Amino acid sequence: MAAAVFVPHVFGQSEKQTSTDLAERFRQMSEQAEQEGLASPFLGITTNGKVTPDLFQISPSGVSTEPVRNAAEKFIASLTGVQLARTMFPVDDAQWRKWMNQHFYVRQGISLGEMTDAQREAAFGLMRASLSAKGFELTRNVMRLNETLAELAGDPVFLGEWLYWITILGKPSATEPWGWQFSGHHAIINYFVLGDQVVMTPLFLGSEPVRATSGKYKGVEILQQEQNDGLGMVQALTDAQRQRAVLNFSKTGNNNLTEAFKDNVVLDYAGLRAKDLTDAARRRLRELVQLYVSNMDDGHTRVKMDEVDRHIGNTWFAWIGGTQADSAFYYRVQSPVILIEFDHQRPANLARFASDPDKPTRQHIHCVVRTPNGNDYGKDLLRQHYLAHPHA
């Protein structure tokens, strides 16, 4: 693995040795995760081990990606030659699949902590052009809460606001495929572009804690609507519907199934099917899906929701955990074209502060959004593009 660990701290000799040893351990853990996670070629998340064909087509979306392309070119122009060599990858590179939520993962590209103020603003310009205002602010708040975690955990070396890396895959183009990846603790964005089409999955957003009650960013709080709207969805079901939707009323651990290096998970539909809901409940489920999709820019959110709507009847809602106002829980929304997971996780970096470190908590949340059936990272669109336009 070619990436280096960025260390934003000045050490004494013994402290420096400890950090060096830890960095080497993290490098080895990262390499092992990659070797195991990338052992199989990409297929995509499926319900039965086989990709459902013809779900995704190369077709004009009617929403311009020129602002994203211009912002990417501005960011690239801001980098030095050395930085550029670390940041640029081919569009079909395995780098797309090299992401992990954990803070120890050794990442590729250039970190925000290494950037000048101008470079960092150019990076944020790329993100603002690609995301909705809501999506950008959520991502920034994940970063801010990683600073809060650094304060609480006493670890400014491997945790912090600027320990997030950016890579560019392919050359920004109006016609050729390209994209970018943003990667760090509790925030991973994969953003693929082909013409005016966009695929923004896998997407991972989370935090521990989800609310800052002290420190530099006191008052920052995230993922409450995702939590509350999911709970509202299950509470609004009839008793009979709830019995079908809830897979287990007991939640004892972490339940997400499609996080890092889980690109080929076989995950059958479970829970309650939207076709069996009332119109009002189906609209509520759609609004829950849109809450996640709308982290993308507004125009491409509409395009993706049109795709979601075409499969709304075959969209499933599943639940694990209690359904009370203070319950910890997991829910999943799954259709042929979208997969969303929300999970209250066990304490991790803050386990020593927890009354029960083995019990899932509302202060540690993981959210994942995927495009099943082979189009995570825009892989199916890229496949179709190469069939139509063979590359050397």
Residue positions per predicted region:
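N-terminal export signals
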Residues: M1-G12
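A cross-kingdom marker for long, charged
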Residues: Q13-S78, A85-S132, F136-A392
